[in-house]
Amino acid sequence: MMEPSAYIPAYLERLYLESHPDLTDAARELLHRDVTANPGKYAQTEHAQALLSYQGVRDHLLDELDRIEDMPDDEFEQTRNRLFDEARDDLLKICRVDALAIDAQLLAVILADTPVDACLGDLMKLEEHARDYLVQSVPGFDLEAPHYWANAALVDGATAASLTVAEPVLVGWLHTLESISQLCLASARYRAGAAYARRALKAEGYPTRAAGTVLLALARLEDEDGFFELAHELEEATGPERLEDSPWYLLARAILLYKSNKMKPAKRALREFANRCEGGAFFLLNPTYLTPYLPTRPAPRDPWDLAHQAVWEAD
């Protein structure tokens, strides 16, 4: 996922540069540093202020979840549910002010205590809302372009990556795609999960491990050709060592071999997962609570976080 601390300053910097096109290179560098350090100073529009409000609500929620981590189970669950309810109330207030605060809407949906099908329905409505806005109102955005940006938008040094990070609605849309893909995977809608994850993977400059969702889905579908075709693409893009260290690839390969009734190779693949991934064996043997993704799969803070995420998603 892309942190608000990355895309909100990029958006604010873009707005400032659009209204001050004649800044020198030195002034642009100073602006970049100042916006990153003091984003509130540049949040002059309702949308910008809504984005910062969202960041504040989310940061507070994550800090509080860290604080209560060592509470006894009953007290933890009660406190967590209260925190979720309070955060959702705050997020809904933001959404009432700004219908384009996509991440705020997404997190509000995730925090709602609704059945899977109802949650998926809400996420799909949000995805359509964000997509319609991007197609109709964002110059240069193109669903059919290789990385969602038409060539006409890639001028004056702009890249697909720089345009993506500076468009909060696009970032929110990508987060929504990932959330849908993960919920589809968790509810055994494997083809849909893979399809939504691939759409998130298409973006450039957007940090994501959505390839793991696709690999797990293809393994569940016993799609051997599709699995190894994607593995080859990832190997070419990132290098063989990074693929071989991916908990999602190693675990999905074990699942695929097991479902294909190749028991000995499956056991070897599972041992490789346990040996190569820190915490892999522990999480396989000890199902451990994982804080819900808020709103999507977070960057790891500890070396074993990736193995924990992969096992949780594959369960």
Q: Locations of the language-model features?
A:
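"A position-specific structural signal for the A-helix of alpha-solenoid helical repeats
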Residues: 10-11, 48, 52-62, 107, ...
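Structural signature of alpha-solenoid helical repeat junctions
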Residues: 79, 83, 100, 165-172, ...
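Long, ordered, amphipathic alpha-helical scaffolds
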Residues: 49-55, 250-315
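Boundary/linker segments of alpha-helical solenoid repeat arrays
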Residues: 102-103, 132-142, 205-211, 237-251, ...
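Alpha-helical repeat scaffolds
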Residues: 38, 84-93, 118-130, 190-199, ...
